[in-house]
A protein has these predicted regions:
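Bacterial N-terminal signal peptides
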Residues: 11-20
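Bacterial N-terminal signal peptides that target proteins for export
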Residues: 2-12
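Bacterial Sec-dependent N-terminal signal peptides
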Residues: 19-36
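Mature, soluble, non-transmembrane domains
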Residues: 71-184, 326-451
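Short, ordered beta-strand-loop transition motifs
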Residues: 11-12, 183-186
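Structured domain cores in non-transmembrane regions
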Residues: 31-116, 186-188, 197-369
Length: 451
């Protein structure tokens, strides 16, 4: 799932510019080992064009994959955020290489006013020739799935471009297929694909015939991502659509779509503190006080928390990181980008920091509660410290499905929206959702630097 630029810019607008490091260190002539450090926070997650995808293959009431004939249906369910679109493909089985699809862009799942699209959406389907096999008379050809000797038979099409089927003798789409959307929850949908053909719907030189529909694929994606299945006027991508269009076999395409499917997770600007004793950001199992952690965890806003750290007597240095390396302005950390910050610490000091998991309501990455000791004995530490980082729930807002919830920064109408969490304690994330492995989202490295 790629990140929508409009909503990303709105999120950036809530973020303050980078906050400089503040220090109140006083060595007082003590010969305590001291070192200068640079910390790099890298977003190592992937950027995905598709949020969700899968196959539909088992007819309603059946236990095994199969085509659907007259009266048969496929059903599948998913959740999707506002702004999402649905694409799919299923074979017109009495053909050489035709599919029903919602086109390059898919169809909107939400209306402009934010309400969900429900009901019959068959009128938005079209019948496409994928351009991979020469056409024969529909319902009679020897290289069509019901009659061919094996998969992938038939001559190559002289016109290899994907295009609308132009055959006035065919039944209308709504005489063959019906697609309906039903709301199942606040963000949930059920799709029903029904074969409404009869034994005589397709009129051929051999008489009337039904039109089976094949197993296929579906995908949910943002409006900014289109032409994920095909481009009209261009050849098939070679990723498996041909196998559906010619033989009703979705697995190859489903596998390739799966590689492009997932949740793109930006990280927010954040704060850090160098301290002794108790962690100044939070205590596990206790409510996050009005120190500004809520603003960071819910909206990626860091100024209040940095200001709070300035008043903590056990904090020797603190600051904010807000501008990605190489960027011209403050903003979220997208996949592949880095934040960096530097500080000076001495033996006995520890590091803590916090950065928001932006596709959430109030989650943040931070080290274990005890922080990261910056010296091993008298030697400064160096290297990858990601294994000491955890995903925490601030306990300030009720969790929604990551990347879907309407009260998360990329989709909320304004900061600080969403119902309160009934459990107000800061805790390690432990709910029904999948946030991915920490090491697949964020990488933290620290190194000693010389003046």
């Amino acid at each position: 799932m790629s990140v929508n630029i409009k909503t990303l810019n709105a999120f950036i607008a809530t973020v303050i510019l980078a906050v400089g490091i503040l220090s109140c260190k006083d060595d007082s002539g003590n010969n305590i080992p001291e070192a200068n450090y640079e910390v790099t926070i890298e977003n190592v997650s992937e950027s995905y064009p598709i949020l969700k995808s899968d196959v539909f293959a088992v007819p309603v009431g059946a236990t095994d994959p199969a085509p659907i004939g007259p009266g048969g249906a496929y059903e599948f369910e998913f959740t999707a955020p506002e702004g999402s679109r649905l694409s799919l493909a299923t074979m017109f089985v009495q053909s050489n290489d035709w599919i029903y699809s919602f086109g390059e862009d898919g169809i909107a799942l939400y209306n402009e006013d934010g309400t969900k699209v429900t009901g019959d959406v068959t009128s938005q389907l079209d019948l496409y020739d994928v351009g991979t096999e020469e056409d024969q008379e529909p319902g009679t050809g020897s290289n069509q799935a019901p009659r061919q000797s094996g998969t992938d038979t038939g001559s190559v099409d002289d016109n290899e471009n994907v295009r609308l089927v132009d055959d006035m003798e065919l039944p209308s789409n709504d005489e063959v297929i019906s697609v309906t959307l039903t709301s199942t929850s606040k963000y949930g949908f059920k799709v029903r694909i029904e074969n409404v053909s009869t034994s005589n719907t397709l009129q051929t030189s051999e008489g009337g015939k039904p039109v089976p529909l094949s197993p296929g694929v579906w995908l949910v994606h943002p409006a900014s991502q289109n032409a994920l299945l095909f481009t009209v006027g261009a050849p098939d991508y070679g990723e498996g659509l041909e196998a559906i269009a010619e033989d009703g076999m979705p697995d190859e395409l489903a596998g390739n779509l799966s590689d492009k499917t997932g949740l793109t997770v930006p990280l927010s600007p954040g704060t850090f503190a160098i301290y002794e004793g108790m962690n100044p950001l939070f205590q596990e199992g206790e409510s996050s006080s009005a120190n500004g952690l809520e603003k960071l965890a819910e909206d990626g806003i860091i100024d209040m928390l940095v200001s709070f750290l300035s008043s903590e007597s056990n904090v020797s240095a603190r600051g904010g990181f807000a501008k990605p390396v190489g960027a011209g302005q403050a903003g979220p950390l997208l996949p592949g980008d880095q934040y960096k910050f530097t500080f000076t610490a001495r033996q006995g000091d520890k590091l803590t920091f916090a950065t928001m998991y932006v596709q959430s309501n109030d989650l943040f990455y931070s080290p274990v509660e005890d922080g990261v000791p910056l010296f091993s004995g008298s030697e400064p530490i160096s290297g990858d410290i990601t294994d000491q980082v955890r995903l925490w729930d601030a306990g300030t807002e009720e969790n929604e499905e990551p990347g879907v919830g309407g009260n998360q920064p990329l989709r909320q109408t304004e900061p600080d929206t969403g119902p309160e969490d009934p459990n107000t304690n800061v805790r390690l994330v432990n709910d029904q959702y999948n946030y991915g492995n920490t090491s697949d989202r964020i990488k933290i490295t620290i190194q000693q630097v010389m003046n």
